[in-house]
Amino acid sequence: MKKVLIIGAGFLQDFVICKANSMGYETYAVDADPDAVGFKHAHHHSVIDIVDEKACLKYAMENCVDGVLTAATDYGVLTAAYVSQKMSLPGLKYKVAQLIKNKYEVRRCLCEHHVDDTEQTYEINRNTDVGYLTQILSYPVM
């Protein structure tokens, strides 16, 4: 039986755990919440923070998983990519996962490649001159 690690075991990942079970996979789940709903359905689970890449990798290696994924959360994307890359499993490259986690970079990339209707992107931080920015923006903004 193939083993799959699901990064996250909350309400939004529970469906994935149940689906993997129904497809015949042996499911492993990690989540920082000891009462995560998905733990009830996973064959195996461990209370591990899903942003702790090294701890998740250790758990995956100890259990010789054949695949790793996350669903419906940005928090587990980097960890899933990290684990899959370190274990030579199929998955997102870590650099792609980093891009996905950075909403500004996603919007900038989409804008540069004319993938959506974004015509302007700005990254805002504590050093941003908001007064100047309000003058140059095209409205409405989101």
What are these regions (language model features)?
Residues M1-K95:
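ATP-binding N-terminal substructure of ATP-dependent carboxylate-amine bond-forming enzymes
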